[in-house]
Amino acid sequence: MLETESSVCDNIAGNEKWRAEAEIGGNERALQALRELIIFPFRYPLEARTLGLKWPRGLLLYGPPGTGKTSLVRAVVQECDAHLIVLSPHSVHRAHAGESEKVLREAFAEASSHAVSDKPSVIFIDEIDVLCPRRDARREQDVRIASQLFTLMDSNKPSSSAPRVVVVASTNRVDAIDPALRRAGRFDALVEVSTPNEEDRLKILQLYTKKVNLDPSVDLQAIAISCNGYVGADLEALCREATISASKRSSDSLILTSQDFKIAKSVVGPSINRGITVEIPKVTWDDVGGLKDLKKKLQQAVEWPIKHSAAFVKMGISPMRGILLHGPPGCSKTTLAKAAANAAQASFFSLSCAELFSMYVGEGEALLRNTFQRARLASPSIIFFDEADVVACKRGDESSSNSSTVGERLLSTLLTEMDGLEEAKGILVLAATNRPYAIDAALMRPGRFDLVLYVPPPDLEARFEILQVHTRNMTLGDDVDLRKIAEETDLFTGAELEGLCRESGTVSLRENIAATAVFNRHFQTAKSSLKPALTIEEVETYSSFRKAAKRSDSKPIPINKKKATSTVFGFSWQLGVLSLLLLATGNYYFNHTKHELLVASAT
């Protein structure tokens, strides 16, 4: 049984005040495309005949589930008082051969009979990827259905007058449909219905709460900001859960409060992130001791483009696409990344080398692509790579694990995805490594890792602040002097200082299980069993990389003197004139790069 409907309000067609925006929040681009496809051919037939314009036959809407593709079509159909026929895999698929094709023919015949000069007829095909999948993954029945649909759409010839039938289809897997459907003459236009941004989420929340009583304390703007990655269906479920929470509290006066939305948000999450752990970290800048200058740089690079995006657009500034944090192990690189994500209220996707290196061919690359796709849908978002040197190690380095084919494929995929961030908004790649020399040079250029920050071991003041952070929930004895302990823990990293505080508490409990405070003797006992893993030589090595990175931005690439001369003189005399030309060119090149050669030989 086909789902057939006309506009339920006969007076809507004559009421110019009602528009689809009354029931749809955001998605202006898709709304305009649908209006042009459905309404324009019937509103401007004379202009079309004058210009010889042939209107498109079909429009394909694609995007994640729950973004409102079906609602968009229904709203525009209602706005223009069109006749609508809805086809779905459930309504088309039949048990016996030939019956599915008959359903399609009947639908197009019914649409043609209702199409008149001033009233369009629309066929909406939902989940078209199920009806017409790619040819390498379909059954015999799918072949027959696809062939019948091709025939029916091709018979719906466009002309200078209005088309007989307008075909609109939707899918959340645009790459899974038959490519023959996407060619010109069938689905001429493809329009993405993307995940709503902050402004669109606010409009959707206002639509779903316009008939309920809201407490003055409810800030829909703040709720919209906190709902990264939520689609329209998720926001509808959020409002429904908030109403249920309010009804449980009091059935007499149904007033939604901020607490109701907080409870609802703990129940309803973004559907695009189901199956993976994606959350905004609860780590704040206060949880990171010291590193004031570094935190300020991260705030400017991560927070500002998200919180002040309008200012960046106004100034014509492109936000950074990647930031690399390098430094010794245990110096709070991961904590800094989480604090930046929390401050920017961005979704946080964390990937480690263990997740990306799989025994199955192509699985790691698929996970990488899928993570970037989910990050685009849940923007603003941060993708964090821990131990980035394993995934992005130098190609051709025989001593590295990345010399394998798997590592090279992962690196190629990462480079491709990072280059694709130029068109995406609100996505930042954060990476951390304690082997910056091992990172492939292709990633170290601007446009990929635009900012390279050195996370040094904590100095005296930073160690004091770190000790304060990790002892703020502990009861300390009067004889505990954290500043003195900081002076005694030179070369200790943040992770080692955290371990020192934890071990001190454990020593206190070993002494007396009923202990209520930690005293200085406990810290001294714990410190005697802990040794810093860092050495002065290692710290100097990390510092030298930072200095070398700064020099490489301003100095020309050094040339090896031996290699330059041997390239010229290695040719034999039999090459005649060609060898003389090469020799002259080499001498000219050598003389004009003498300074660079001296620098190279000195280093």
Curated annotation (Swiss-Prot):
Compartments (UniProt record): Nucleus; Cytoplasm, Cytoskeleton, Phragmoplast
Q: Which residues form a coiled coil?
A: none
Principal location listed in the UniProt entry: nucleus
Q: Which InterPro entries match?
A: AAA+_ATPase, AAA_ATPase_domain, AAA_lid_3, ATPase_AAA_core, ATPase_AAA_CS, P-loop_NTPase
**Coding gene?**
CDC48B
Signal peptide residues on this chain, from the entry's feature table: none
Domain of life according to the entry: Eukaryota
What cellular component terms from Gene Ontology apply here? cytoskeleton; nucleus; phragmoplast
Spell out the family assignment given in the record's similarity comment. Belongs to the AAA ATPase family.
Sequence positions that bind ATP: 63-70, 327-334
Question: Does this UniProt record's set of keywords contain Transcription regulation?
Answer: no
PROSITE patterns (UniProt xref): AAA
Q: Name one GO molecular function term.
A: ATP hydrolysis activity
Q: One Pfam match, by short name?
A: AAA_lid_3
Q: What is this protein called?
A: Cell division control protein 48 homolog B
Function, please? Probably functions in cell division and growth processes. Interacts with certain SNAREs as part of specialized membrane fusion events where vesicles from the same organelle fuse (homotypic fusion).
Sorted keywords for this record are: ATP-binding, Cell cycle, Cell division, Cytoplasm, Cytoskeleton, Nucleotide-binding, Nucleus, Protein transport, Transport
User: What does the entry give for GO biological process?
Assistant: cell division; protein transport
